[in-house]
């Protein structure tokens, strides 16, 4: 089709957006430790990361759908990312760090869900844009940038991470400015009755409940796995390597993501991912070497990616077209709220239990999410076609 957006540009958008995340999230625990923040304060700081995301994401998503312009929302958010990160460099002490976290996350939090929704909009308009292939580039961006940032932080200090974050945000903004697609839908408006119908649907609420529980565990793991690495002999460069392994392990599952969803069905894929999460966290709880911790993260592909693809595809199917960005950002808000609970609860628990006991608790939380998905499977009557190889 004439004027079709080149796939390589969308690939690079995903690469750069997830690269922005790779400059920040793997190193927040290290940053907080260097600021002299206690475990309990660290839990509060991580909870602010999630709480800010949970509040900001639906607002950004609503604006993107209301004005039918995901591209403009991404440009505004990325411009905020370019500048806001320097507040972390200047902050000192728990309260200033906390305010900086709120500022940074206000602009960072919409990037992934709105980019996801933008990709789905491109696919509906042009066809041939498979989400899993683009998300693969996101994982690659996160992996390479996290690895580079870990090495750079060890060489030159934490400040270099903020410069890289700002540069990646600027690069992503330039890429999106070069894409001439605004997903405008004249005559389509967001109606509050549609929102009420969607979010009172018991299937949607069960799915979001399972996402919430899963990300209580995922959020706690993401924040405190650096402590597990230190407890088993690792350092900051090994943390960068760990997140590189996490992201690289996602690639084959994202490449074949659409086939896996069609073959298993969304909810069956969700069940497999959650069962693997239970095993993954139990294995983490008995590690005695950072090498083993890194090796276990190879399970990321069929844990987190199965859960992510299953949830997004199910929501995209259940939501009416005018509410798909809202649905994506509410999913992201459930992820963020779960992360907030996991971060805050994990920080408090670590005042009383070891990091190894915390991982046993995370396995139990994932088992509870598995129960919710099993109930959802029982009430979901939609037949999903099996993929013919």
What is the predicted role of each segment?
Residues 66-78, 262-274:
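Cytoplasmic membrane-interface "Motif A"-like loop-to-helix N-cap segments
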Residues 2-50, 204-242:
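Helix-loop boundary and gating motifs at the non-cytosolic
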Residues 151-168, 348-366:
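A membrane-interface helix-boundary motif in multi-pass transporters
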Residues 104-137:
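Cytoplasmic helix-loop-helix junction between adjacent transmembrane helices
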Residues 55-69, 153, 252-265, 350-351:
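Helix-to-loop junctions at the C-terminal end of transmembrane segments
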Residues 1-4, 179-211:
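Juxtamembrane intracellular "pre-TM" segments in multi-pass secondary transporters
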Residues 79-92, 275-288:
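C-terminal ends and interior cores of transmembrane alpha-helices
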Residues 39-40, 125-137, 236-237, 319-331:
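Loop-to-transmembrane helix entry/capping segments in MFS-fold secondary transporters
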């Amino acid at each position: 089709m004439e004027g079709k957006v080149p796939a390589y540009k969308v690939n690079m958008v995903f690469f750069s957006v997830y690269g922005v995340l790779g400059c920040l999230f793997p190193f927040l625990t290290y940053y907080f430790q260097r600021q002299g923040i206690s475990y309990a304060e660290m839990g509060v700081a991580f909870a602010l990361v999630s709480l800010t995301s949970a509040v900001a994401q639906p607002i950004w998503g609503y604006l993107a759908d209301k004005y039918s312009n995901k591209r403009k929302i991404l440009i505004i958010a990325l411009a905020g990312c370019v500048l806001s990160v320097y507040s972390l460099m200047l902050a000192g002490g728990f309260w200033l760090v906390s305010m900086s976290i709120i500022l940074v996350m206000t602009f960072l939090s919409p990037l992934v869900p709105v980019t996801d929704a933008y990709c789905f909009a491109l696919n509906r308009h042009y066809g041939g844009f498979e989400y899993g292939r683009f998300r693969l580039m996101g994982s690659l961006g996160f992996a390479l940038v996290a690895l580079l940032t870990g090495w750079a932080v060890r060489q030159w200090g934490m400040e270099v991470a903020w410069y890289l974050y700002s540069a990646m945000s600027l690069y992503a903004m330039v890429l999106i400015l070069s894409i001439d697609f605004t997903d405008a839908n004249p005559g389509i408006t967001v109606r509050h009755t549609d929102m009420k119908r969607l979010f009172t649907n018991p299937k949607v609420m069960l799915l979001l409940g399972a996402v919430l529980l899963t990300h209580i565990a995922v959020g706690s793991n993401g924040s405190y796995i650096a402590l597990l690495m230190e407890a088993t002999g690792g350092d900051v460069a090994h943390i960068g390597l760990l997140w590189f392994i996490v992201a690289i392990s996602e690639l084959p599952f994202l490449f074949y993501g659409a086939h896996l969803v069609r073959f298993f069905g969304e909810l069956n894929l969700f069940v497999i991912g959650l069962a693997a999460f239970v095993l993954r966290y139990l294995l983490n709880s008995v590690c005695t070497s950072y090498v083993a911790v890194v090796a276990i993260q190879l399970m990321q592909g069929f844990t987190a990616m199965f859960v992510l693809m299953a949830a997004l595809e199910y929501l995209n199917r259940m939501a009416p077209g005018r509410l798909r960005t809202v649905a994506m950002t509410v999913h992201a808000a459930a992820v963020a709220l779960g992360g907030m609970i996991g971060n805050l609860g994990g920080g408090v628990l670590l005042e009383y239990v070891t990091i190894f006991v915390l991982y046993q608790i995370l396995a139990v939380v994932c088992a509870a999410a598995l129960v919710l998905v099993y109930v959802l499977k029982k009430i979901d009557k939609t037949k999903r076609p099996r993929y013919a190889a």
